[in-house]
Amino acid sequence: MNILVTNDDGIMAPGINILAQKLAEKHSVLVVAPDVERSATGHAITIRTPLWAKEVKVGEKTVGYAINGTPADCVKLGILAIADFEIELVVSGINKGPNLGTDILYSGTVSGALEGAVMEKPSIAISAADWNNPKYETAAEFLLEFLDTYDVTKMPEFTALNINVPSVDRAELKGWKVTRQSRRRYRDYFEKRKDPYGNNYYWMFGEIIEDDPGEDSDYAAVRRNYVSITPIYAFMTNQNYMPKLKEELEGGN
């Protein structure tokens, strides 16, 4: 397959380099990724300044382009302007740390995959689910095997797979689980500090809230050393609430 690879940790990050080299064993890989880290940029795109593309070498077999933009920018630019062949799959990652629960709302990694989905390409976001000890090799090996097993062309439109791989050796993975997005989120707070000139600034911290009791969630799967595979959708309408809201606001109309 012709695969476009991006990330939000930056084109020099180990995760994307390990991923690109592993995928290049069986596929044609084009890397288009931010020139610096763009973590937690969400689905931002650049519309007021130009985008620059600098060719770089990623591993031994892969051509890459460093972009002064976001992951979503990279996917747009890669598909529409840089690639001289048809992109068949977008892969975003390997992210350093998990993208579970509400992480996906902020994640540049997940947004890169969702941008691919919006552009009607099968898309995957993949994360090594440990900030302190990410097992990029495990995640890369898993994805290469997964692509041999799963036909990405069967994915419905505007859908991406959010994959979180536990931070263990490949032999220790118990398998995979198709999961739902958990309610894992954060209780945020800000610490007020002063710079050397006496000016106030704020540094954000967050405590993880894991109050989702279900065993079918992304977090529950990763906790038990299963790879979590969650189908996510580009459109965010709450279909379950629509009938009730319609009745309350429109009545019989």
From Swiss-Prot:
Keywords: Cytoplasm, Hydrolase, Metal-binding, Nucleotide-binding. Pfam families: SurE. Signal peptide: none annotated. Binds 1 divalent metal cation per subunit. Its main location: cytoplasm. One of its GO terms (molecular function) is nucleotide binding. Its EC number is 3.1.3.5. GO terms for cellular component: cytoplasm. It catalyses: a ribonucleoside 5'-phosphate + H2O = a ribonucleoside + phosphate. A divalent metal cation binds at D8, D9, S39, N95. It comes from the Bacteria. Its cofactor is a divalent metal cation. It is found in: Cytoplasm. HAMAP family: SurE (MF_00060). Nucleotidase that shows phosphatase activity on nucleoside 5'-monophosphates. NCBIfam families: PRK00346.1-4, PRK00346.2-2, PRK13935.1, surE. Belongs to the SurE nucleotidase family. This is 5'-nucleotidase SurE. The gene is surE.
